[in-house]
């Protein structure tokens, strides 16, 4: 058996697994330690722990759709995670700028899928605010997804391989 000359980036799935584990551990802590819908200040005037639930997607999109949306979001997350895993298998290991965001999105997506299967909703608990302006509550899986999406966006903007060529 010959070794591939350029190992793929599937090793980055270890980061996805770590994100899933940390996400589920924090949510287990939230479910056993925080009261529902009561702010617990972390940094007064900016950050609370706030246990809440989201049956929808980002910003509670489709949260009142009647239940079918859970299966849509599970299918989307699994499909996107599968596609990104395939892309990781085609990405050389040394290309961390691509592999890192893919791994973040996979870990965050699967973390929220686990919530939907176990609870029928996603557990959120991080609440940021300034004065009376509150950002929607979120969790570590959401943070990983957003960081990964930002990474992909930055890569597409600044990576020389994807930049238009000048004559």
UniProtKB/Swiss-Prot annotation:
Organism in which the protein naturally occurs: Xylella fastidiosa (strain 9a5c)
What residue ranges are annotated as transmembrane? 10-30, 68-88, 98-118, 138-158
Q: Where in the cell is it found?
A: Cell inner membrane
PROSITE patterns to which the protein is assigned, alphabetical: SPASE_II
* Ribonucleoprotein among keywords: no
Residues of the active site: 124, 142
Identify the GO cellular component terms for this protein. plasma membrane
Give the GO molecular function terms.
aspartic-type endopeptidase activity
* Coiled-coil annotated spans: none
Q: Which gene encodes it?
A: lspA
Q: Report the protein name in the record.
A: Lipoprotein signal peptidase
EC number(s) for this protein? Answer: 3.4.23.36
């Amino acid at each position: 058996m010959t070794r591939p000359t350029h190992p793929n980036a599937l090793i980055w799935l270890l980061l996805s697994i770590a994100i899933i584990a940390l996400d589920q551990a924090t949510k287990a802590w939230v479910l056993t330690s925080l009261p529902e819908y009561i702010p617990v200040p972390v940094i007064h005037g900016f950050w609370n722990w706030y246990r809440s639930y989201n049956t929808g997607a980002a910003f509670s999109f489709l949260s009142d759709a009647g239940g079918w949306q859970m299966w849509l979001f599970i299918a989307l997350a699994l499909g996107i995670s599968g596609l990104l895993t395939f892309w990781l298998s085609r990405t050389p290991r040394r290309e961390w700028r691509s592999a890192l965001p893919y791994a973040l999105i996979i870990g965050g997506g699967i973390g929220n899928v686990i919530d939907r299967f176990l609870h029928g909703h996603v557990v959120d608990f991080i609440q940021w605010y300034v004065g009376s302006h509150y950002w929607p509550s979120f969790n570590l899986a959401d943070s990983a997804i957003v960081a990964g999406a930002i990474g992909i966006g930055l890569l597409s903007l600044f990576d020389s391989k994807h930049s238009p060529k000048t004559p």
